Amino acid sequence: MALTKADMAERLFEEVGLNKREAKELVESFFEEIRQALEDGVPVKLSGFGNFDLRDKNERPGRNPKTGEEIPISARRVVTFRPGQKLKSRVEAYAGNVKQS
């Protein structure tokens, strides 16, 4: 089961004591700040978690999987995420203990 923004807001309500409206607004505001920074071309660095960066990809040849026809894949900007060392360590520590769904 995936962790959702609603789950995060619920945890803020339960553990921090914000009311549900404030918790939802805080979660939305947090992600809006990340979206806005990336939209403005600013990398996002969250210490202990990881970095969101922008990368420009050049146009490249591609293929339509149904027809086999060659088609160009246009140049575009993509968001990349690189996990920080603390996050990597914690995930790797649990890698053998959790069943994948």
Curated annotation (Swiss-Prot):
Q: Name one GO cellular component term.
A: cytosol
Keyword line: DNA recombination, DNA-binding, Transcription, Transcription regulation, Translation regulation
Disulfide bonding pattern of the chain: none
Keyword field contains NADP? no
Q: Name one GO molecular function term.
A: structural constituent of chromatin
Q: Name one GO biological process term.
A: positive regulation of metabolic process
Give the superkingdom in one word. Bacteria
Q: Which CDD domains match?
A: IHF_A
| InterPro entries for this protein | Hist_DNA-bd, Histone-like_DNA-bd_CS, IHF-like_DNA-bd_dom_sf, IHF_alpha
Q: Which Pfam families match?
A: Bac_DNA_binding
Family classification: Belongs to the bacterial histone-like protein family.
Q: What does this protein do?
A: This protein is one of the two subunits of integration host factor, a specific DNA-binding protein that functions in genetic recombination as well as in transcriptional and translational control.
Complex and partners? Heterodimer of an alpha and a beta chain.
Q: Which NCBIfam families match?
A: himA (TIGR00987), PRK00285.1 (NF001401)
Q: What is this protein called?
A: Integration host factor subunit alpha
Name the source organism.
Alkalilimnicola ehrlichii (strain ATCC BAA-1101 / DSM 17681 / MLHE-1)
Q: Lineage of this protein's species?
A: Bacteria, Pseudomonadati, Pseudomonadota, Gammaproteobacteria, Chromatiales
The encoding gene is ihfA
